[in-house]
């Protein structure tokens, strides 16, 4: 029996508080003045606060043995003609972009990390839409890929899959696996899709740029991106967008979930002008209307929505990222229908994460949690119907989840009859 002790009130909070001190919104508009080459400490950078900190955070995950010591800034500004083609229906003004500045990360042992950070300057007045972009790339792949491997290149994909499987186990992280956070990366890079405008979605891998990379909802996903970066270096022919979505599929399967349909061919857009605006990801403090509206915008019905939410049987909330804290189920690295069972069987009462003040639901012994949006699935009668169905029929859940997640990975992607992705001119 489900007993929710507090009456349900659709809680409206002020916009989400910034919980990650290293990612400050204000830095998005920070003007980066060109100066001579200089060295800046990663840990107290005066100007590149966001860039340096978030990058150092990413890199230090993979390179714990050798934390980055210094960042070298090459601040040369060179006027180069844009390689952006004008849109067919709306010709662009002749574009001049400023060459991005390059930051090389040096390690104590003097070896270069193999990464560099490109910081694109604030937009030129003539290009209204262009924002300052921050992109983390491997040095081996500064030429961004606007075409991924072909759907026929099965052998290459198999090698990438194998490499992804190798990075998933991580005994010193959370519950011993990067699977949940990598799955979340795949979901979030697709969840920006807007079926009404046709933009957003995984194609383009726009999460390499601000404002998407600094969207509050994406806090913590640098862990997943940096874990996959060495794979990108080793297999440069796969695009980030293909790699991140493939990694989501493999994570689900490796955690015991169903086989997710996936095809390659996504491209990486060459700059930040197609980054969707913040605010498209679902907000966990909101109600059923918001869930229906957000998933409806992506093209999902109630059944698909409830099946996708079953992924909350995996992983956990982190107060340092979202402000919420705790796991949904007892087995957070094992894909199952436990989320629905727990949601129905436990008694939930509203409480507060002491350190952040964020409200969430706790079960009786406070070992498990639910977010408001999770609880909304049993408050809303239409959602509740599917929660009950999936709690009783794991096979049905697996089938529905595989279909819905496969659909999620394809949002915004058009393919020809051979399965190859049709080019989106605006990306190049
Ligand atoms: C109403 C929709 C949703 C909301 C509001 C929501 C919100 C959240 C929040 C706040 C977290 C905690 C992040 C952190 O602190 O690290 C989280 C984690 C997670 N979410 Fe969702 N989510 C939603 C839907 C989904 C969907 C559809 C999927 C996948 C299909 C998903 C997969 C995950 C996973 C696997 C984690 C755990 C990540 C980890 O352990 O690092 N979520 N979600």
From Swiss-Prot:
Its cofactor is heme b. Its EC number is 1.11.1.-. Binds 1 heme b (iron(II)-protoporphyrin IX) group per subunit. Keywords: Heme, Iron, Metal-binding, Oxidoreductase, Peroxidase. GO terms for molecular function: heme binding; metal ion binding; peroxidase activity. The keyword Protein biosynthesis does not apply. PROSITE patterns: PEROXIDASE_2, PEROXIDASE_4. The keyword Heme applies. Residues 21-32 have a biased composition (Polar residues). It is an enzyme of class 1 (oxidoreductase). Heme b binds at residue 312. GO terms for biological process: cellular response to oxidative stress; hydrogen peroxide catabolic process; response to reactive oxygen species. Residues 1-33 are annotated as: Disordered. Belongs to the peroxidase family. Cytochrome c peroxidase subfamily. Destroys radicals which are normally produced within the cells and which are toxic to biological systems. This is Putative heme-binding peroxidase. It comes from Debaryomyces hansenii (strain ATCC 36239 / CBS 767 / BCRC 21394 / JCM 1990 / NBRC 0083 / IGC 2968) (Yeast).
């Amino acid at each position: 029996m489900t007993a929710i002790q507090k009456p349900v009130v659709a809680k409206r909070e002020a916009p989400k508080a910034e919980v990650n001190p290293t990612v400050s919104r204000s830095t998005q508009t920070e003007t980066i003045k060109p100066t001579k080459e200089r060295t800046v400490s990663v840990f107290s950078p005066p100007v590149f606060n966001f860039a340096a900190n978030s990058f150092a955070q990413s890199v230090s995950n993979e390179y714990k043995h050798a934390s980055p010591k210094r960042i070298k800034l090459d601040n040369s500004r060179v006027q180069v003609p844009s390689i952006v083609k004008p849109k067919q229906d709306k010709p662009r003004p002749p574009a001049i972009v400023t060459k991005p500045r390059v930051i090389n990360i040096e390690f104590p042992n003097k070896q270069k990390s193999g990464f560099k950070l490109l910081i694109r300057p604030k937009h030129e007045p003539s290009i209204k839409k262009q924002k300052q972009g921050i992109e983390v790339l491997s040095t081996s792949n500064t030429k961004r890929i606007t075409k991924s491997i072909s759907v026929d290149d099965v052998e290459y994909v198999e090698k990438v899959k194998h490499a992804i499987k190798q990075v998933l186990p991580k005994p010193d992280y959370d519950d011993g696996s990067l699977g949940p956070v990598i799955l979340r990366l795949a979901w979030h890079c697709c969840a920006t899709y807007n079926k009404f405008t046709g933009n957003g979605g995984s194609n383009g891998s726009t999460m390499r740029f601000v404002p998407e990379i600094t969207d509050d909802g994406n806090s913590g996903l640098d862990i997943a991106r940096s874990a996959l970066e060495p794979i990108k270096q080793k297999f440069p022919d796969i695009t980030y967008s293909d790699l991140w979505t493939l990694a989501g599929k493999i994570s689900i399967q490796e955690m015991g979930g169903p086989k997710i349909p996936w095809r390659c061919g996504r491209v990486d857009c060459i700059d930040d002008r197609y980054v969707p605006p913040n605010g498209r990801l679902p907000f966990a403090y909101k109600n059923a209307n918001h869930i229906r509206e957000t998933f409806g915008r992506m093209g999902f019905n109630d059944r698909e929505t409830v099946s996708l939410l079953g992924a909350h049987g995996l992983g956990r909330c982190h107060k340092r990222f979202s402000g919420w804290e705790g796991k949904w189920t007892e087995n957070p690295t094992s894909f199952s229908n436990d989320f629905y069972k727990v949601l129905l069987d436990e008694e939930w009462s509203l409480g507060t994460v002491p350190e952040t003040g964020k409200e969430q639901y706790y079960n009786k012994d406070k070992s498990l949690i639910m977010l408001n949006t999770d609880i909304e699935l049993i408050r809303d009668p239409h959602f509740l119907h599917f929660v009950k169905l999936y709690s009783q029929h794991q096979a049905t859940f697996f089938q529905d989840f595989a279909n819905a997640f496969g659909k999620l990975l394809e949002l915004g992607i058009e393919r020809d009859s051979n399965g190859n992705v049709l080019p989106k001119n605006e990306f190049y």
